[in-house]
Amino acid sequence: TPWHKRTLMKMAPTREAHDRLVFWLLLLAGSVLYLSFGYTEMAGSDMWWHIAAGRELVQTGTIWMVDDWSYTESGSDWLNHEWLSDLIYYGWVSLWGVETLVYWKWLVVISSFLLLQLALSRTSGNDFAGFVCAGIAIAIAAPFIDVRPHLYTLLNFSLLLYLLLGRQPKLWLLIPLFVVWVNLHGGFFFGLMALAILLFPWRELSFKTVQAAALVGIACLVAAMLNPSGFGTFLYPLKYAFDETSP
């Protein structure tokens, strides 16, 4: 009836406002939750090493480094695949002091899991489900949240999910992501593995869709080669994983 139609039309804006309020409240709740998990040990086992490596980069003025710290490998080429992270650490500490790295950690952690929450909320169509699943994810990750470059992999992985879950791939976003990621942390390798799964046309399998996905994947693979060691950076995680003398 006309009366029912008018009633439904009046209720629609109210429902929309309610959903928007719930969305923002869950983001706020998520921020507080993720901040609380950031109250862990600040100094990672190699935090000082990364700060010193950043200082070395600034002092030498080159990203192609030589190992002058160790005894057995002194003078050898140094594959510092996390050079950009080291520069960020050293720059941050030089500007604001080492104590403020805790704020850097909170910024990266909150951003990482808010992006994950947003990606999951959008994909599931349920804001509360996105909040709960992101909360479970950070609870699992909590023992590993300290000041080390691996936090950038958490951030970039969440960004990758946000860009690709339920969306068409955009090369102008994915290529810069992998160029930056490969120079921040070796976890880019897992990002490329996840990229293959996210790009594969599971529901619309055809030569054309597979070809399109492959072209995007190849472009991101080439982008990841834009680092000081080129393809050597791809071999480093494999060498580290299968070398029985690695810690």
Residue ranges and their predicted role:
Residues F157-W172, R203:
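Membrane-interface transmembrane helices that cradle and orient dolichyl/undecaprenyl
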Residues F144-L151:
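Short acidic/glycine- and proline-prone juxtamembrane loop motifs at membrane-interface regions
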Residues V58, F189-P247:
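Transmembrane catalytic cores of multi-pass membrane glycosyltransferases
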Residues Y34, A137-A141, Y162-L163, W172-G186, ...:
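Membrane-interface alpha helices of multi-pass inner-membrane proteins
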Residues T1-L35:
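Start-transfer (signal-anchor) and selected internal transmembrane alpha helices
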Residues F23, L28, L116-I140:
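Transmembrane-helix signature of polytopic, membrane-embedded enzymes
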Residues Y103-T123:
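Transmembrane-helix motifs of polytopic, lipid-linked glycan transferases
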Residues T72-E99, Y103, L107:
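Short hydrophobic/aromatic helix or loop-helix immediately within or flanking a transmembrane segment
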